[in-house]
Amino acid sequence: GFADEEGVRYQTAYLGSKVIAGCFEASDLKRKDADGIAMAEAIRKFGGDPMKLQSARLNPKKLLGYVEAHIEQGPVLQKKNLAAGVVTAIAGQSRFKIIFTGHAGHAGTTPMDMRQDALCAAAELVLAVEKYARKTTDLVATVGQIKAEPGASNVIPGEVNLTLDVRHQKDSVRRAACFALQKIAQKIAGARKAKISWQ
């Protein structure tokens, strides 16, 4: 991972690896975190020079190999009572920001059959993501953040923002899963008369 493997702050996984592989997108420097701090600014605060990232690619002809010692972040080795393991593949990641937009309304006076509850659409997608991932070998998919607006106990949620993280060792399987999950989300939105944004 080298730096920022998970990419939580700027939603850019494998930042350091992308830099040394020559795959870093300069446009990512404009990404902002939850506090509005641009990636370029954060790199400067840590003593780095964001303008040098594009030229930091390592020459593969000068490398014999690479070994990285890493802790296991999951429970598999412990469950199998093993002290160490050898990585045979690294899962690629896809991340999405999804917004369901329905119609906010009074919780006490809006009949159930007249609601466009964005949270119900999001909840349905969360369960669909889990179901899809469970039936696909080695696929993991996670809705890690969810925020309902306006966020009052007496108001039907009119908008829900959520994140989706999809991972698999084979890019083709991961891409197919992302495509399928987007179609599922669109179907859910249509059935619930909600709008959906998938980024």
Name the predicted role of every residue range.
Residues G1-A84, L127-V155, L162-D165, R175:
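Acidic/histidine-rich catalytic neighborhood of metal-dependent amide-processing enzymes
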Residues A3-G7, A104, K170:
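Feature marks short, surface-exposed loop/turn motifs that line or immediately flank catalytic pockets
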Residues R31, D35, V86-G92, T110-A121, ...:
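Short, contiguous, pocket-lining structural segments
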Residues E72, T101-H103, R167-Q169:
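Solvent-exposed residues in well-ordered beta-strands and their adjoining turns
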Residues A89-G102:
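Acidic-glycine-rich active-site phosphate/pyrophosphate-binding loop
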Residues K97, G108, L119-Q199:
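Metal-dependent amide/peptide-bond hydrolase catalytic core
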Residues A104-T110:
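Short small-residue beta-strand/loop micro-motif enriched in glycine and branched aliphatics
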